[in-house]
Amino acid sequence: DVLGSRGLGDVYKRQGKKPCLSLRELEKQVNTDLDMLVNIVDGQMTVCELVDRYLKTKTGVRQSTKQGYVTMQRLLAKESFGKKTIRSVKTSDAKLFLIKLQQEDGKSYSSIHTIRGVLRPAFQMAVDDDILVKNPFGFQLAGVLVNDAVTREAISKDQMRKFLKFVHDDVVYCKYYEVVYILFHTGMRISEFCGLTLKDIDLENRTVNIDHQLQRTSDMRYIIETTKTDAGTRVLPITEDVAQMFQAIIEDRNAPKVEKSIDGYRGFLFYDDNGMPLVAMHWQHRFNHMVGRYNDIYRVQMPNITPHVCRHTYCSNMAKSGMNPKTLQYLMGHSDISVTMNVYTHIGFDDAEEELKRMEEFRKAQAEVEQKKEKPMSQKMFKVV
């Protein structure tokens, strides 16, 4: 039989199934697994079944990633493409499905990129298992979809200065000034900032310990997760002005009488009216309101500024100032130096022009110094023969 000589009991022991299912539930589960195994043998597995099987191999993923998988499975379950057998899916079918998602369903490029990011390895698994000969999703998205993704650009130093001044002077938003300043001058991820506790901030030695982040799931559960990458776990040195901002936040901290523990962490910097720590979404909304208010007042509009734009801007400013790339990589918590150099650093014409002017001024100054070192030649230096 398809299970071999070991039998169903051995299969369930190997898979770690708990013996707490009712007989009817166990029978249903066995039938489901048998159907899937038979489908593998005769090649009639559907796209939905393939994705479900692939996702079972993805263990140890973050909560946010799991939520994305559930969304993906729900989407496929509603699509006729999800009911197609995997052997019937051609490359043109795969392309047309993604085009439909963008042109008919209005899905964004980034969303479709994420969907393809599950379908391609799922079909590759079928190829590796000798069920398929070719991966129908083994093509590049360029030329198939219109890339409408909005690049999160860093803002200029002048824009940063104007926005900080506006927040500082505004009677409503001045209470957020310290947070905006810190994000612009440390490059912290907003989830890292939200996860900071009093124990993580050492004002005496001017360091901030970053080894976790605070998240809120779609079902409104608050969880602590490790940093995005191993490199994200770091001790961040801070300048005197940033230390003063943290000092002000700590002094004005309005914590509930009984601070709720989130996965063993308490002592967060900001709380909402329900006594729960603020998360990334709260700050995203506040940034939206601040930018909206600024653009209502001033004729020259401010581009969209988010906590992540603050991170881009910090990285860009540090790169333009001449900071060593490896140092910048550490401060940003990037696992790959190419991310630091290629994604977060935004060098444009104005920056190139300014750099050339600096080099020209340096060469002129160097030439003047060398000219002063040379003694002028006079007639007295020659002997009359």
Where are these regions (language model features)?
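Catalytic-site neighborhood detector that most strongly recognizes the C-terminal catalytic loop/helix
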Residues: 146, 154, 213-216, 332-358
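Basic, Lys/Arg- and aromatic-enriched nucleic-acid-binding interface segment
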Residues: 113, 128, 132-196, 204, ...
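Short, polar N-cap/turn motifs at the start of nucleic acid-interacting alpha helices
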Residues: 200-207, 323-345
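N-terminal core-binding DNA-recognition domain of tyrosine site-specific recombinases/integrases
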Residues: 18-19, 40-43, 52-131, 149, ...
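C-terminal secondary-structure termini that scaffold catalytic or DNA-interacting sites
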Residues: 205, 218, 223-233, 240-242, ...
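Short, basic (Lys/Arg/His-rich) helix/loop patches that form interaction surfaces
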Residues: 105, 165-176, 186, 236, ...
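Single conserved hydrophobic/aromatic residue that forms the stacking wall/gate
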Residues: 1-15
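Basic, Lys/Arg-rich DNA-contacting stretches centered on the C-terminal catalytic core
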Residues: 144-147, 191, 204-237, 241, ...
